[in-house]
Each structure stands twice: as structure tokens, then as C-alpha cells.
A protein has these predicted regions:
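Interfacial helix-cap and linker-helix signal at transmembrane-aqueous boundaries
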Residues: 38-39, 70-71, 156-164, 219, ...
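Membrane-interface helix caps and helix-loop-helix hairpins in membrane proteins
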Residues: 100-101, 165, 191-197, 222-228, ...
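C-terminal membrane-cytosol helix-exit motif in multi-pass small-molecule transporters
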Residues: 122, 174-193, 209-221, 238-253, ...
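Transmembrane-helix bundle of Major Facilitator Superfamily
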Residues: 1-186, 321-322, 329, 333-335, ...
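Peri-membrane helix termini and adjoining interfacial loops of integral membrane proteins
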Residues: 180, 421-432
Length: 488
């Protein structure tokens, strides 16, 4: 084999894996601007419409650790294709949905598919590229796709809903997924260390996945029922009980689904805290900003989607610079700068008025937050995998994505609760509906800005600059084939 062959093969495989990842990120937000149309056609009640978003986030966040560990134990390409098949089939089912229950079920299965697929894809990337400049380049592109995918989803959702119909936001995944399934066996290497014992931690998987699903469910339903409602408290108590049981199980079993020793990697722990807070601030910023544009400024689905183009283009434009800065100086400063920008963008957006204008009131905060995603997603992706052993690659990538999805669910739930509560207070005080809605969104944006800024002390306390700088300094490219157990 020539020295060029593995390089070309790796980047072909990376392109396919990146497309699969991009689909999962886009589907987090692509339905946001389509919700009114979906609600009308499928006869959702106003309170139940949130489950079109929540069902996906719930299963996505809940099953990520399970998907990551399954990839390490059962073969990463095999699990990737299983998840991709589920995601594609569920996308088709969602497009063909004729009722509310069918749509929610399809979105839940779509989330499971994404949770199985995503850790496998990222761990394959990690094992194709050795630590150093080339892995940083790959993860820089990966992080850039994550940063731009959320805003691209809103834009694509607006365009498709306006000109084709909401069904096409789901049809879009079907041909892409089908082509990826055909190409994956040909260009994506299978990997699994032969030394890994294939014992599956069933008790830990059930307790951990069940606890995460209940946690996301409790957070998601809290805006509807209230944080003090018996139903919310009961679900939260169940989540806590299962998660405590999960920790006890993981301390005792021989082959845990989440070896707790992985948190001794301080950089990994810091990156996951930053990922949690990034999801809690930026994903919720998109949610609140879209509601403000549609409910207060009366933007159409297309207008609301296109408005986010400013953030998306900024993120894409700065992704290369972010990757270069990380390679030269490590992740800590770049990550902290990115989270500062996201927090600052949300706080700037608190100044939006009732009769707002895009250029005067929205473009600036969106550009600042978009820049923040480029400088946050990329170093977080790199730091979360720095120093991780190959046999734990799926686990580490699943852990990072779990942090981001749980953060998004928590942030949206908190923002919804704060906005709804403050809006009701203003309405009872005699304010007109547009002013009350705007006041509620402003209050929520203050909270989201604070969530973003909370990441800064965690980054400086936990992320070790020397660990990542050492990895960045290694420029040798590893041929992955000897380390991979090829399977037919």
C-alpha cells in the first residue's frame, strides 16, 4: 500500500461520515419553523405540538451512551449502518405521517437512529486519524458542521416548508441516507479492538438509558405542567433513582457501559461541561429567536429560516480559523472565547423591541453567536477526545453528544419556563400581547446568556492546555489499518 492510499481512503470515508453527522444535527432544528404547518395538518393540540421536537431530543439524548458503547463492542461500521438505516426509515415514516401519534413515534425512532449512528461515526473518525494536525483538521471540519448544522436546519426548514411542504423536511433524509447505506460498506473501515471483551453491561445500559430518557422527559414537560407539579417531580425522582443505580452498577461491574475512570481525564470532563452549556445556550437561543420572529414580528417560516443565515455563514467562514488557532495554541483559550461570544450574543439579543427590525436588532446578536459556535464546537470536539484510548472512542464521542443534547433539552425547557412565566406576569399587569411576549423572550435570553458564560470557569479549571497542545504538536499521520480489526 502506498503512503497516499490510506490518506485518500480516510478522507473519502470521512466525507460520508460527516454527511451522516450533519443530518442528525440538522434534524434537531429543521422542524422548528415547520411546527405551525405540522400542527394544522396532523391536528396537534397547542400543548402537544412540542413533542414533535421533544420526542427526537428525548431518545437522541437518552440512547447516546448505549450507542457509543455498542459501537466499541460490536463494531463501529456495523452500528453506524444500523443507526443510519433506522434514521432513514423513520424519516420516511415521519414524511408519510397522517396523525399526531404516528409523527411523534416516527420522531422518537429517528432519535434512536441518530443516537446509535452518531457515536459510531465520530469514533471511526477518531480511529482513522492519529492525534495531531490531521485529526485536528478532521475534527475542525466536524465541529464546523456541528456549528453550522443547527442554523442550516432552520434555514432548510423554512425553504422546504414554504415551497414544497413540511413533509419534505423529512423526505430530504431518505435519498441521502440510502446512498450513505450503499457506500458505507465500500469506503468506511470496520474497527474494533480484538482485545475488547464482548460483555455487554445490560443492567447499566437499562439504568443509564432509562435515567437519561426520564431526565429529558421531565425537563421537556416542565414548561407545560410546571416544575412543582406532581407529575414533573415524579418523573424527576424516577430519573434520579435510575441514575444513582446506574452509578452504583458502573462501580461494580467488570465491563461497565460508562467506566467512571474516564472522568479522570480532566480535559474530557471540562469539554463535556462546556458541551452541556453550549447546547443549553445556543440551541435554546435558536428556539427563542425563532419564536420571537414568528410570534412577535410575524415572520413566515421562510423569513424566520433565512434570518439565521447570518449566523450560519459566520460560523462556516470562521471554522478554518478556529481549527488553525486550536492547532497552534490548544483548545482552552479558543473554547472560552467561543462560549463568551455565544453568551454575549444572547445577552445582546435581550434588547430586541416589540417592533424589531432584522438589521437593527437581530443581525448583530446572530453574527456574534454564530462566530461563537465556530470557536466553541471545534475545540470542544477535539478536547473531548484528547487522550482517549481507542477502545473507548465510541464511549467518549457518545458522552460528548449526550452532554450537548441534554444541554439543549435543559436550555429549551428553562427558556420556555422563564418566557412563559414572565409573559403571564406582564399580561396580568395589563401589557398588550406583543409586549408581553417580547418581555418573556427577553427574560429567557438573559438566562441563556448566563448559561453560556458559566462554561468559562469550568474551561479554565479543567481543560489542560498542555495535554491538547501536545496532541496538536504531533503531525505524523497514522495508517489505521494495522490497528483496526477488519471484518467482512
Amino acid at each position: 500500500m502506498t503512503s497516499q492510499s490510506p490518506h485518500i481512503d480516510r478522507w473519502r470515508a470521512f466525507a460520508l461520515l460527516a454527511v451522516a453527522f450533519f443530518m442528525t444535527v440538522v434534524d434537531l432544528t429543521i422542524v422548528n419553523v415547520s411546527l405551525p404547518a405540522i400542527g394544522r395538518d396532523l391536528h396537534f393540540s397547542q400543548t402537544n405540538l412540542q413533542w414533535v421536537v421533544t420526542a427526537y431530543a428525548l431518545t437522541f439524548g437518552g440512547f447516546l451512551l448505549l450507542g457509543g458503547r455498542a459501537a466499541d463492542l460490536l463494531g463501529r461500521r456495523r452500528i453506524l449502518m444500523l443507526g443510519l438505516g433506522l434514521f432513514t426509515a423513520a424519516s420516511l415514516a415521519a414524511a408519510l405521517a397522517t396523525g399526531a401519534g404516528f409523527m411523534v413515534g416516527a420522531r422518537a425512532v429517528q432519535g434512536i437512529g441518530a443516537a446509535i449512528m452518531l457515536p459510531a461515526a465520530l469514533s471511526i473518525v477518531m480511529n482513522m486519524f492519529g492525534e495531531g494536525a490531521e485529526r485536528n483538521k478532521a475534527l475542525g471540519i466536524w465541529g464546523g458542521l456541528g456549528a453550522g448544522g443547527a442554523t442550516f436546519g432552520v434555514i432548510a426548514g423554512g425553504l422546504l416548508t414554504q415551497y414544497a411542504g413540511w413533509e419534505y423536511i423529512f423526505y430530504l433524509n431518505v435519498p441521502i441516507g440510502a446512498v450513505a447505506l450503499l457506500l458505507a460498506p465500500r469506503i468506511v473501515p470496520e474497527s474494533r479492538l480484538e482485545t475488547v471483551r464482548r460483555r455487554f453491561d445490560a443492567a447499566g445500559a437499562l439504568a443509564g438509558t432509562g435515567g437519561l430518557v426520564l431526565l429529558v422527559a421531565a425537563i421537556s414537560q416542565a414548561p407545560q405542567y410546571g416544575w412543582g407539579a406532581t407529575r414533573t417531580i415524579a418523573v424527576l425522582a424516577g430519573a434520579v433513582a435510575l441514575l444513582v443505580a446506574f452509578l452504583l452498577i458502573e462501580r461494580r461491574v467488570t465491563d461497565p457501559i460508562l467506566p467512571l475512570s474516564i472522568f479522570r481525564l480532566r480535559t474530557l470532563a471540562g469539554a463535556n461541561i462546556a458541551g452541556l452549556l453550549l447546547g443549553g445556550s445556543f440551541y435554546a437561543f435558536i428556539f427563542v429567536g425563532t419564536l420571537y420572529m414568528q410570534q412577535v414580528l410575524h415572520y413566515s417560516a421562510l423569513q424566520a429560516g433565512l434570518a439565521w443565515l447570518a449566523a450560519s455563514l459566520t460560523s462556516i467562514a470562521l471554522a478554518g480559523l478556529s481549527q488553525a488557532l486550536v492547532t497552534r495554541g490548544g483548545t482552552k483559550i479558543v473554547m472560552a472565547a467561543g462560549m463568551t461570544m455565544i453568551g454575549a450574543g444572547a445577552i445582546w439579543a435581550t434588547q430586541v423591541p416589540v417592533h424589531g427590525h432584522f438589521l437593527a436588532n437581530l443581525a448583530g446578536p446572530m453574527v456574534v453567536a454564530g462566530a461563537g459556535t465556530a470557536f466553541a464546537f471545534i475545540p470542544i470536539s477535539i478536547a473531548a477526545l484528547a487522550g482517549v484510548k481507542e477502545q473507548q472512542a465510541g464511549l467518549a464521542s457518545g458522552l460528548l453528544n449526550t452532554s450537548q443534547q441534554l444541554g439543549g433539552a435543559i436550555g429549551i425547557a428553562i427558556a420556555s419556563s422563564v418566557a412563559a412565566s414572565h409573559t403571564q406576569t406582564l399580561l396580568h399587569a395589563g401589557h398588550a400581547a406583543p409586549a408581553a411576549l417580547t418581555g418573556g423572550f427577553q427574560q429567557a435570553l438573559w438566562v441563556l446568556g448566563a448559561i453560556g458564560l458559566l462554561a468559562i470557569p469550568a474551561i479554565f479549571a479543567l481543560v489542560r492546555r498542555e495535554a491538547v497542545s501536545t496532541a496538536a504538536a504531533k503531525t505524523s499521520v497514522r495508517d489505521p489499518q494495522p490497528a483496526l480489526a477488519a471484518t467482512s
